[in-house]
């Protein structure tokens, strides 16, 4: 018999019940016991769904109040010492303070979980870090599930991945040196789990899909030789990429089973066809929302069944944390777009797909002929749908001129033409894009969406806000203005709603971090722009002032990265389609007299593949898609882009290759350290390093901004330096926004006068 299991389940509930309960708890509107009871009910529901789908185990330990890596920091006693908390007696309030900060300490840093849109809390390791086992989190969930009558498989992230995901703090050392101390703690935790009578323990080691240094790889054998002494079977789970290059190492590990991601890396299967133990085949996509073609999946699984027999397990490719909960609640989508609805599968539907596969493997395809037929019909309809495939889009991409993604002239010539008409002072000041989104703006937008506010009244409200934003910028004496983006709910959703080929769900939420969830757009078909999206707002804003108004767009790579993307054509093709669609908007803005246009790309870096060898190909198509978004603009139109990350050094040639006339970057928190990379690289175009941190309501002093600008002037010629905040101001309040910008403009004017002498 084939075994069915799940690597992990979403935690937040079908309608984000956990999120709302957490936030009420933080506001002191909900008692701790009520939060604990709700969490228990959500876990029980998750286990029931798995059991009803004929899963041989329900997975426990995957539920968390904030983040599974934070839970592991608690379980190993590795919470940051700076908080002064005892991990053995940690209260729920203290747990949340680790994640959210308190009056004395800032929160633990967050970063992306591999190349997903989920964020984990980064462990802080010090030379003198000491570990201490506290398996309560896992043990309690095992007992709870067993009491409900379930067969249980706990999951825990493995020691090498856990260490790899952390950062060294304080005195210089290599966190790898902590492994010797950490492994006995893991042994203690696993022993506690085994003592609860579990047969299998799933240990996740996704770091194996990265380019790990040799000493880390070499450590796997010894680490797992120690952990294998635990009185339970160990399933080592890998995902997010191929581990084929480590096949010999993995076959030799003293574990009892291995999970492979056969969605992201189907080609790796051939390296493991002679694996002598349990092979868990990750055949249902845990990171996207499309139905699988179950007949095709069975074509892969049936030969494996013949080889592995009882040793074959089936599962999603990775945890289902990255997919929304239940398609059945999307009644509006089913009504408005029944065709698309038939092609989708959320978590519960994916579990049902696995159940069909299990039945087919155990009793033959005829036992589930109806379900397989339905799956095939949906796959065929999708392959041939004219809702998806538009001949004119493919034709337009195929017929792009050879140098479509190149500007007419090099930057040195363009900038002369731009400076001539822009006529800006030295160190021009601007804003990144958004201004505070007040409650009034949000209410007006919500009322309009619900049909409670007429189009005319909604537009009047937005125009009033735009005028307010323009007047404020004029009073502040900023040089290049923005319209403030009052009409935009989200920098990707706004464009997705206006581009063809996109759809939106109502409950398609996935966890980003803690209580924050995002609802990615669905890119299901060829992308086109039926009509202008931003032109009238920018044009209206420009009509209010004699100063230069900047148009604002989200770039193709960011739109791609923050969406659920169709899986029937390469991501690179989808990205280029978006770029070409955006170019129509850019040219319309240019025609309307908006000749400074910003195309934001905050997500270019996060799209980087996990393995270095794949970077060049990605950066090539991502760069091309970005350049296509402004194809055809005149030399005197100035293209800006904005990016916010802390690491540029390794991708600077690609950033320069975007050939934006001005790049604005987030640098204030790193004290301008980023700029040395741009200077060493001799970055050729204009740069606007952020001079204050917008993530804080704090108003910077004139001295702080002056210090940062003087540092910037040491590495960037004054003629090429712009002055701006780190990021958009959407989440700030108006009071601090005005005060922050006032200081920025005053300091700029002081330095301008000095430089003019």
Swiss-Prot record:
SUPFAM superfamilies: UROD/MetE-like. InterPro entries: Cbl-indep_Met_Synth_N, Cobalamin-indep_Met_synthase, Met_Synth_C/arc, UROD/MetE-like_sf. Keywords: Amino-acid biosynthesis, Metal-binding, Methionine biosynthesis, Methyltransferase, Repeat, Transferase, Zinc. It catalyses: 5-methyltetrahydropteroyltri-L-glutamate + L-homocysteine = tetrahydropteroyltri-L-glutamate + L-methionine. 5-methyltetrahydropteroyltri-L-glutamate binds at residues 16-19, 112, 516-517, 562, 606. The keyword Oxidoreductase does not apply. The keyword Methyltransferase applies. Zn(2+) binds at residues 642, 644, 666, 727. Pathway: Amino-acid biosynthesis; L-methionine biosynthesis via de novo pathway; L-methionine from L-homocysteine (MetE route): step 1/1. It is an enzyme of class 2 (transferase). GO terms for molecular function: 5-methyltetrahydropteroyltriglutamate-homocysteine S-methyltransferase activity; zinc ion binding. Its EC number is 2.1.1.14. This is 5-methyltetrahydropteroyltriglutamate--homocysteine methyltransferase. It comes from Actinobacillus pleuropneumoniae serotype 7 (strain AP76).
